[in-house]
């Protein structure tokens, strides 16, 4: 596949699938690079660092854990521009959050995080009952059963992926993270490479 596609460069981000692809590309003398998002690199990037032409890091400390063929470059973490350029005022208008109301955004990454979902369940029920704050929570793609639990507690099913009650919205996945992040007064999330 690599030979047929003939890429100009191959870039990996540490997933186990990137290992064999980058190893084969390196054998074919195709320029290869990896990007490590974490302070402590995973196994795949540790192995590839010795073979690739360029290693890019989010944080400088990661270099201590890598045996790089060439000097690594600290690039930081590439972030979509819309995450940085949205105004709080326009984001809150887009989400219909009134001025003076507090907005909490909570999520456990794209797949979700069961401990966070479990912890947030009672908090979200309380916020929905008292209407004191606006709250958007994502259960993640692996947390769809939580939507049914909220419906059992009186939430309205807006769609297959969204339930709502009063000032609380629970989503399977947040497609407009740029808007939600810009509008939020408080973000509760698990530690992840890009969150």
Where are these regions (language model features)?
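Residue-level detector of alpha-helix initiation sites
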Residues: 15-17, 39, 110-111, 115, ...
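Active-site-proximal region of nucleotide-activated glycan assembly enzymes
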Residues: 26-89
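Conserved nucleotide-sugar phosphate-binding/catalytic loop shared by glycosyltransferases and other
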Residues: 1, 75-78, 141-146
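Donor-nucleotide binding loops and adjacent catalytic segments primarily
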Residues: 88-90, 97-189
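Glycosyltransferases and closely related glycan-assembly transferases
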Residues: 1-11, 18-33, 46-51
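Hydrophobic acceptor-binding patch used for acceptor engagement in glycosyltransferases
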Residues: 10, 186-187, 194
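Helix N-cap/beta->alpha junction signal
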Residues: 14, 58-60, 192
């Amino acid at each position: 596949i690599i030979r047929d596609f003939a890429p100009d460069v191959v870039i990996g981000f540490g997933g186990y699938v990137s290992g064999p692809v980058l190893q084969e590309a390196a054998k074919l003398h195709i320029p290869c690079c990896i990007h490590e998002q974490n302070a402590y690199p995973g196994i795949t990037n540790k192995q590839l660092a010795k073979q690739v032409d360029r290693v890019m890091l989010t944080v400088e400390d990661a270099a201590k854990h890598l045996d790089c063929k060439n000097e690594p470059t600290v690039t930081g973490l590439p972030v979509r521009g819309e995450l940085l350029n949205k105004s709080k005022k326009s984001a809150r208008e887009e989400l219909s959050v009134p001025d003076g109301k507090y907005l909490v955004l909570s999520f456990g990454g794209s797949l979700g995080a069961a401990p966070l979902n479990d912890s947030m369940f009672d908090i979200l029920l309380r916020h929905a009952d008292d209407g004191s704050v606006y709250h958007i929570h994502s259960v993640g793609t692996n947390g769809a059963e939580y939507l049914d639990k909220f419906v059992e507690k009186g939430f309205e099913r807006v769609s297959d992926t969204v339930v709502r009650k009063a000032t609380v919205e629970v989503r399977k996945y947040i497609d407009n993270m740029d808007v939600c992040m810009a509008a939020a007064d408080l973000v509760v999330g698990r530690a992840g490479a890009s969150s």
